[in-house]
């Protein structure tokens, strides 16, 4: 037993945050409240309403509502699978090398990178795949952790 404890400590130091440790409730929601809520909160229209009048909502800085775990993962593993990765990527995984258009909302400078890292850890090892709408395979979607 005595030997096991240092081994465990070394293990947790090497992997400071495994995907299972990052949850929507503990890490993503507070980040979302800070960075995304003003345009995707309760005052934003549900997705199907948003789609009917995109232009008007966009002019008003309103995107589709994502104010619960369920409405958020809709853009991750649901009908809009992968949208979150497409929008938040910093450009290192996109075809044209340009960041997704929500990346800039993740904060300034270092904070932006750190917040992206939290999102990536939440999605899980190997699951941050940037592909077009409808292009993620079932296997790729199944890799997504996104713990509640
Ligand atoms: C200043 C307002 C604003 C902020 C802040 C903002 N968004 Fe957005 N977002 C929009 C608008 C408007 C759209 C719809 C237009 C578009 O598709 O680009 C959108 C679209 C999206 C989409 C695509 C939805 C779809 O149709 O598939 C995702 C995903 C997204 N945002 C995630 C986020 C996340 C995560 C954050 C916080 C890090 C965030 N946004 C912050 C305004 C914002």
Residue map of PLM features:
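Sec-dependent signal peptide recognition
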Residues: 2-10
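Aromatic- and Gly/Pro-enriched helix-to-coil junctions and flexible linker segments
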Residues: 20-148
């Amino acid at each position: 037993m005595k030997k096991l404890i240092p081994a465990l400590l070394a293990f947790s130091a090497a992997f400071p945050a495994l995907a299972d440790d990052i949850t929507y409730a503990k890490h993503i929601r507070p980040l979302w409240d800070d960075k995304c809520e003003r345009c995707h909160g309760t005052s934003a229209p549900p997705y199907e309403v948003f789609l009917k009048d995109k232009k008007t909502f966009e002019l008003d800085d309103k995107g589709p509502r994502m104010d619960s775990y369920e409405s958020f993962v809709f853009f991750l593993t649901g009908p809009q699978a992968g949208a979150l990765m497409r929008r938040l990527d910093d450009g290192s995984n996109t075809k044209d090398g340009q960041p997704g258009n929500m990346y800039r909302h993740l904060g300034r400078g270092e904070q932006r990178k750190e917040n992206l890292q939290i999102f990536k850890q939440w999605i899980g090892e190997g699951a941050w795949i940037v592909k077009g709408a409808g292009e993620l395979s079932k296997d790729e979607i199944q890799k997504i952790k996104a713990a509640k």
